């Protein structure tokens, strides 16, 4: 049995990952290696695309590599399945309903692995598919947001030794009671990295509909450029701040177990040379690279799926933050930015942001439970905000970065509602209507449209 955790609160066991090494290790593709491929929903979006994925995987297997593949559900399938669930039970799901939602949502990936295994067999490649519970991938019981506790890789290793490609469902696992669980949106990324960690894979390649990690979303800033490398710290911040390329927990896994990650496109020709393919996209690196330190800001992340609440006129007494946020945490709702104003006349205002999908639940909690309990005067709610962040490992050693950000936004007439900082990022909360203007202005201000330095 080999096990791992998605974060500090899950630390129970440690994956064996001796094969992972460091970024300066020899190229793992020069000799036979165990490689994990992950394909997103768009890459699996049609029979033709699935056949192309199979051809790409078969190419790697024929080159002598042991291959484990983790596909997502076909694009749109998870939404379709959850839409069916909503149609038969439109109410707010309780614990029992969340269990059934996981049972339903997990079927999307089950279809994908079966189709991909069939496509590989059609290519003359021995292949077998497994669901998360068949492996098994063991999780806790937090339905729709489960965390991986351990992976038993014995069955998978036996199939690899027999020359088979193993296709495993992403996004899902099984809890201690035998119930199917899902890891939350983007959970297939986490599944792939966890499998790579458990099996000591040489590298985990994440195939998406983009060809790497960009300085920001090219749909917002056409001049955004692809980065050849990005540090683990920067990628973790970018993912947690709204970048859709990788799911946050997958980056946490990669950092904890030193899994080499590369993000690349599944829409390049499947028959591209393996050595060329293995060097494409963006490598998430663990080296403290001097070249990286020269870039003060590496990227701009943004998230429009946020909502802000302000509890007005709260008694300024010890423990007030816990009284407000404790009830929110008990409802399994994650809080992002938190700001408490300076006290006036013994009262203060307390603001925080949550994911927009939790807006109604938090609104009801504040109205019916929190505000009456803590003695606040009232609360306000704003579901139309966004968060824009600058990220860069060079911010550790450069002064004046935040002031440049604030000046740039002021010159565009954009008001800042909230600010939060860490060693390598500064985030601001803005009115949603200013998001794209802010991202474009900051991208220019920090010179991110300039060519990436080489050497």
Where do the language-model regions lie?
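Nucleotide/pyrophosphate-binding catalytic subdomain
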Residues: 20, 27-251, 430-431, 446, ...
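Short hydrophobic alpha-helical runs that function as membrane-insertion/retention elements
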Residues: 203-207, 261-263, 336, 418
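Glycine-rich beta-alpha junction loops
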Residues: 74, 210-212, 257-261, 265-270, ...
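A conserved regulatory-domain signal marking ACT and ACT-like small-molecule sensing domains
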Residues: 273-455
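Acidic-aromatic/histidine active-site loop/patch
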Residues: 254
């Amino acid at each position: 049995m080999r096990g791992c955790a998605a974060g500090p609160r899950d630390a129970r066991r440690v994956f064996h990952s001796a094969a992972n090494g460091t970024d300066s290790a020899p190229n793992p593709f020069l000799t036979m290696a165990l490689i994990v491929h992950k394909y997103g929903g768009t890459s699996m979006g049609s029979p033709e695309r699935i056949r192309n994925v199979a051809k790409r995987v078969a190419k790697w297997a024929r080159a002598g590599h042991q291959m484990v593949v983790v596909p997502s559900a076909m694009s749109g399938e998870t939404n379709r399945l959850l839409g069916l669930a909503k149609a038969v039970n439109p109410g707010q799901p309780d614990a029992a309903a969340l269990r059934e939602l996981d049972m339903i949502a997990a079927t999307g990936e089950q279809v994908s692995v079966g189709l991909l295994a069939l496509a590989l067999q059609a290519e003359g490649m021995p292949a077998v598919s497994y669901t998360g519970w068949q492996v098994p991938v063991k999780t806790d019981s937090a339905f729709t947001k489960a965390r991986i506790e351990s992976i038993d890789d014995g069955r998978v290793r036996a199939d690899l030794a027999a020359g088979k490609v193993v296709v495993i469902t992403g996004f899902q696992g099984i809890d201690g009671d035998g119930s199917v669980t899902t890891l939350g949106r983007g959970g297939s990324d986490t599944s792939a990295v966890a499998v790579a960690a458990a099996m000591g894979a040489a590298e985990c390649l994440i195939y998406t509909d983009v060809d790497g990690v960009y300085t920001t979303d090219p749909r917002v800033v056409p001049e955004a450029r692809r980065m050849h490398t990005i540090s683990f710290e920067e990628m973790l911040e970018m993912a947690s701040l709204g970048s859709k390329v990788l799911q946050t927990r997958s980056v946490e896994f990669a950092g904890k177990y030193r899994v080499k990650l590369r993000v690349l496109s599944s829409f390049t020709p499947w028959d591209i040379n393996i050595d060329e393919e293995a060097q494409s996209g963006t490598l998430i690196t663990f080296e403290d690279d001097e070249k990286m330190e020269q870039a003060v800001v590496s990227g701009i992340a943004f998230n429009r799926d946020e909502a802000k609440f302000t509890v007005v006129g709260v008694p300024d007494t010890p423990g007030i933050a816990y009284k407000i946020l404790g009830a929110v945490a008990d409802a399994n709702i994650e809080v992002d930015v938190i700001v408490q104003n300076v006290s006036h006349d013994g009262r203060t205002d307390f603001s925080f942001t949550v994911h927009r999908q939790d807006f109604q639940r938090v609104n009801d909690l504040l109205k019916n439970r929190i505000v009456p309990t803590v003695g606040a005067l009232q609360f306000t709610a704003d579901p139309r905000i966004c968060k824009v962040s600058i990220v860069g490992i060079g911010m550790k050693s450069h002064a004046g970065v935040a002031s440049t950000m604030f000046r740039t936004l002021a010159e565009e007439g954009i008001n800042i509602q909230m600010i939060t900082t860490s060693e390598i990022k500064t985030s601001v909360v803005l009115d949603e209507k200013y998001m794209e203007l802010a991202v474009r202005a900051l991208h220019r201000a920090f010179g991110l449209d300039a060519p990436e330095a080489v050497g």
